[in-house]
Amino acid sequence: IFGGTFAKNGEYPWMVVIDLPEFACGGVLISKKFVLTAAH
């Protein structure tokens, strides 16, 4: 993201990051049990 800024911890509590050594992916909490991610 060009021109973006870092978010503070807790600023977007519905956002999720899945950060593994092989890849990183983002998601969004849609309930207390489920995370919605892109299919890639």
From Swiss-Prot:
InterPro entries in alphabetical order: Peptidase_S1_PA, Peptidase_S1_PA_chymotrypsin, Trypsin_dom
Domain Peptidase S1: 1-40
Pfam families: Trypsin
Domain of life: Eukaryota
Location within or outside the cell: Secreted
Transmembrane residue ranges: none
Single GO BP term: proteolysis
GO cellular component: extracellular region
Family: Belongs to the peptidase S1 family.
Protein name: Serine proteinase-like BMK-CBP
Species annotation: Olivierus martensii
